[in-house]
């Protein structure tokens, strides 16, 4: 089986071209390939597939084998793959995901895609739709008791569920301990991604992320979008800002007119191989 390893802001996935390869059990394959000691090593597996209603379709699986709705960093790399490998010459394409249809704008340099802008759609703020078990309509800057401590949470879905927590210094956090506890809290019936955000200015923030099913990763595109939305709602960031993650920077904009969130970032090839 041939594969391509790519990353967006350090968020690395194994990509399988399902125009050429047949995958019978992607859940099991994701676990095997993602193992950083016994496999290839990645945050998960992405299948690039034909679509009946869009330019292309993607399915993605976390490193624990669970299927995820969307990944902002992964979808940029899908855009890179289909252009670089000659499946399209268009610079504006659509990709079908479990979180809906996403629109991509591709930016070539020397006939290779280096940067991609994604229309991530409107954020979901209603607690029942995220989903979050909560007595109010929305969960915005609410103090929640956990077994070890209290945290102030804002819940946002960008096709997959996130809670955003504002902290003084992301570098000082025990992200694994805190993230794991919040991810599995019963108020989140589908578990939750946890985004820790340190505000640097109205136009810049740092972030670390604990992803459900994968643990801490170098970056999370939907998480960065959720962080921007939560920051705007709480008066901490401008609608257009940079989010710096462990693996690199993402440029975000929450358009006031359409309410859509746009994310721009890198898409990079790591290597190609057979497994």
Curated annotation (Swiss-Prot):
Q: What InterPro entries would the database entry show?
A: DAP_epimerase_AS, DAP_epimerase_DapF
Any Gene Ontology CC annotation: cytosol
Q: Which UniProt key words apply to this protein? A: Amino-acid biosynthesis, Cytoplasm, Isomerase, Lysine biosynthesis
What are the positions of the active site? 71, 220
The EC code for this enzyme is 5.1.1.7
Catalytic activity entry: (2S,6S)-2,6-diaminopimelate = meso-2,6-diaminopimelate
- Please give one Gene Ontology molecular function term for this protein: diaminopimelate epimerase activity
- Superkingdom of source: Bacteria
Could you tell me the Gene Ontology terms of the biological process aspect for this record? lysine biosynthetic process via diaminopimelate
| Biological or metabolic pathway of the protein | Amino-acid biosynthesis; L-lysine biosynthesis via DAP pathway; DL-2,6-diaminopimelate from LL-2,6-diaminopimelate: step 1/1
Q: Which residues bind substrate?
A: 11, 62, 72-73, 160, 193, 211-212, 221-222
Question: Which HAMAP family has this protein been placed in?
Answer: DAP_epimerase
Job of this protein: Catalyzes the stereoinversion of LL-2,6-diaminopimelate (L,L-DAP) to meso-diaminopimelate (meso-DAP), a precursor of L-lysine and an essential component of the bacterial peptidoglycan.
Q: Which family does it belong to?
A: Belongs to the diaminopimelate epimerase family.
- Protein name according to UniProt: Diaminopimelate epimerase
Q: Tell me which species this is from.
A: Azobacteroides pseudotrichonymphae genomovar. CFP2
- Read off the lineage from the record: Bacteria, Pseudomonadati, Bacteroidota, Bacteroidia, Bacteroidales
Q: Which gene encodes it?
A: dapF
